[in-house]
Regions:
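A conserved hydrophobic secondary-structure block that centers on an alpha-helix together
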Residues: 37, 46-60, 147-182
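Active-site-proximal, well-structured secondary-structure segments within enzyme catalytic domains
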Residues: 30, 34-36, 63-69, 73-118, ...
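Short pre-active-site segment immediately N-terminal to the catalytic Zn-binding motif
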Residues: 350-370
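The catalytic-center signature of Zn2+-dependent metalloproteases
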Residues: 382-409
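Extended, charged alpha-helical coiled-coil/arm scaffolds that mediate oligomerization and mechanical coupling
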Residues: 25-26, 30-68, 75
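Single conserved hydrophobic/aromatic residue that forms the stacking wall/gate
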Residues: 2-7, 11
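Active-site recognition of the HExxH zinc-binding catalytic motif
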Residues: 168, 363-380, 401
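Catalytic Zn2+-binding segment of zinc metalloproteases
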Residues: 176-177, 374-387
Length: 470
């Protein structure tokens, strides 16, 4: 242990010497950038501390690592452990494809003849959007939003204050007032006050829009004689009714033109047009995968044939897999110690259909698929000497993915890849027009949902956590 500490301190001192040396100006710009990132990373993560402060910092890191793992495992346990099972007479309003996928999910869990609504967003969202069963909608909503908050062995309420306390103590060892101040120092906002100012401005506008959206929903519920006041578990259901009333747009009708396999082909087409990438699926088993659902593709330059990297796609939900959608790399491009090419993946949680059935996804999910593929294209397009320089700065990292979303609505993609699952007919122009007209529909809710999380995150990380009651 002493030898390891001595080595760490020698590395630290060497990095500081390099950065503070006059010779830094003789390096190439990318080398200067690398030197700064390494030096700043060491300094911001406690490497310059000495004595007891250094020991305490290391102990905090160890405890936080354990707490973060426990927290994530608790959420995952609740996603796996809480499943709502339906009988056939409780399927009212649900699309056939969704019901078939729910039946397959139940069968996988040994519940033949029933229908499983799993505790993941990919299952919860469509159920809350289409199910006519209000009591079941409430049950599914409460189950999802209570992950890690059920008062059992997987409850996270005791972990949250401890995590916040440790984060706060750790940055105070570095001289910062709170965790948010430390986190924002090297971001565009620079300090918490600016973030709060921005979020509060967004909050005022988004909540005003939400009030209008809820009023539209309430009007439809009243006209139907529902005799209810709109609650959170009603929001998606009545939002879909408002969408149909205002824009004559049926989400399930749109979904019939959004086959997952076709969308993957569309993404590959866009990558070819923009970056000259060609994707060839590897099916001979020569590349190991972590699950049978994962497909592997070699990426080459379609003009030169040069190998660019390997792309993995892990599209379906399964027990033990965290929810959501994301992109990641397992190896980044670099050349300083010989050429190493990118190994990266896209991961989603679509509901796997019955054997042989095509997987249909919503327009929102299709946008997310394209969004995350934008991150993968960023990885694959990298051309840097040092792996530390991959990825760009955090504030900017969503730009390429947000741009990629726009390609879903281009004529080239729509005309060639959005075809009806049964007839093969291209999506009608009038339906495309409706999709485009409704592009900003429900933005009040979506913006408020995200902003609320951001405000809570900021408040948690700027307040004194010692007396926090979660």
């Amino acid at each position: 242990l002493d030898i390891r500490r001595q080595r760490q301190m020698c590395i630290r001192d060497s990095i500081r010497t390099v950065w503070e040396s006059d010779e830094i100006e003789d390096l190439r710009p990318d080398q200067q950038r690398l030197a700064w990132l390494v030096y700043d990373g060491f300094a911001r993560n406690g490497a310059m501390l000495e004595g007891e402060a250094r020991e305490r910092y290391a102990a905090i890191n160890q405890e936080l690592a354990e707490l973060h793992t426990r927290y994530g495992n608790n959420v995952l346990a609740d996603e796996e452990g809480y499943v709502t099972y339906l009988s056939e007479d409780q399927l009212s309003g649900l699309p056939e494809a969704f019901a078939a996928a729910a039946a397959a999910a139940a069968a996988d869990r040994g519940r033949e003849g029933e229908y499983a609504i799993t505790n993941t967003r990919s299952s919860m969202d469509p159920f809350l959007t289409f199910s006519d069963e209000r009591e079941l909608r409430e049950q599914v909503w409460r189950t999802y939003y209570s992950r890690g908050d059920n008062g059992d062995e997987h409850d996270n309420n005791a972990l949250i204050p401890r995590i916040l306390e440790l984060r706060n103590e750790r940055v105070q060892l570095l001289g910062y007032d709170n965790y948010a101040a430390w986190r924002l120092e090297n971001r565009m906002a620079k300090e918490p006050g600016r973030v709060f100012e921005f979020l509060e401005a967004v909050w005022a506008a988004s909540t005003a829009r939400v009030a209008e959206e809820v009023a539209d929903m309430q009007a439809i519920a009243d006209a139907e004689g529902a005799g209810i006041t709109i609650e959170p578990w009603d929001y998606r259901y009545y939002a879909e009714k408002v969408r149909q009333a205002k824009y004559d747009l049926d989400s399930d009708e749109v979904k019939q033109y959004l086959q997952l396999d076709n969308l993957i082909a569309a993404m590959h087409f866009v990558a070819g047009e923009l970056f000259q990438f060609h994707f060839s699926q590897i099916t001979d088993g020569s590349v190991p995968v972590w699950h049978e659902d994962v497909t592997v593709w070699e990426v080459t330059n379609r003009n030169t044939g040069e190998h660019v990297g390997v792309w993995y796609l892990d599209p379906f939900a399964r027990p033990g897999k965290r929810s959501g959608a994301w992109a990641t790399t397992y190896r980044s491009h670099e050349t300083y110690d010989g050429l190493k090419t990118t190994l990266g993946s896209n991961n989603s949680n679509f509901i796997k259909g019955a054997p042989g059935e095509p997987v249909l996804i919503s327009w929102d999910d299709a946008e997310t698929l394209f969004h995350e593929f934008g991150h993968a294209l960023h990885y694959l397009s990298s051309n840097v000497a040092y792996p530390r320089l991959n990825g760009g700065v955090r504030d900017y990292t969503e730009l390429q993915s947000q741009l990629m979303e726009r390609w879903l609505q281009t004529d080239e993609v729509i005309d060639n890849y959005l075809v009806h699952v049964d007839t093969g007919e291209p999506i009608p122009d009038e339906l495309v027009a409706k999709i485009r007209n409704a592009a900003t529909f429900n933005q009040g809710f979506e913006t408020t949902e995200y902003t609320a999380s951001a405000i809570m995150d900021m408040k948690y990380h700027t307040m004194d956590p010692s007396d926090l009651d979660v």
